[in-house]
Curated annotation (Swiss-Prot):
The gene is mntP. It is a multi-pass membrane protein. It comes from Paraburkholderia phytofirmans (strain DSM 17436 / LMG 22146 / PsJN) (Burkholderia phytofirmans). This is Putative manganese efflux pump MntP. InterPro entries: Mntp/YtaF, Put_MntP. GO terms for molecular function: manganese ion transmembrane transporter activity. The keyword Lipid biosynthesis does not apply. The chain crosses the membrane at residues 3-23, 41-61, 62-82, 104-124, 132-152, 168-188. GO terms for cellular component: plasma membrane. It is found in: Cell inner membrane. Belongs to the MntP (TC 9.B.29) family. Keywords: Cell inner membrane, Cell membrane, Ion transport, Manganese, Membrane, Transmembrane, Transmembrane helix, Transport. It comes from the Bacteria. Probably functions as a manganese efflux pump.
Amino acid sequence: MNPVATLFLAFAMSTDAFAAAIGKGATLNRPHWREAVRTGLIFGVIEALTPLVGWFLGKAAAQYVSAWDHWIAFSLLLVLGARMVFNSFNTKEVEETKPSAHSFWLLALTGFATSIDAMAVGAGLAFVDVNIYSTAAAIGLATMAMVTIGVMLGRVIGHVAGRRAELAGGIVLIGIGSTILAEHLNIFG
């Protein structure tokens, strides 16, 4: 995978966490930059680790599915991207109580919940020629940056940008999956 695709993947994977961070920022009276960075670090580390776990699980199965690996990567990215696009149009609001402070465990649980798709992407990347360590680092750094910004913007922009970010992330994932398939099938020459 080329560096531009890696960059797009990294930011696409961070959009769920960005949307969650906007919600977390909206629950704070006045988000302080230290809380934003702390939240970004927690989410970023988790988001960097989950594609590694998925990649190792995918590599374990690679010898059995190498003939159709590109279809697996495409399908996983298509399903995840479509789910993100669908969720961006879901207008059902969830009523939740506002915490007085964000505990480490609350942030870690939220970070893990938003990184499940990164684990699936990691599994899909096991079937593609990619440096998983640099890809995971890019995902973690992008997530850290997006979450830090999301917490700070949470009070101001609320849930509207969260939905748009998820829509954009879903479209990017579908595009990356389509590119992987097109490259393997040599569609572009």
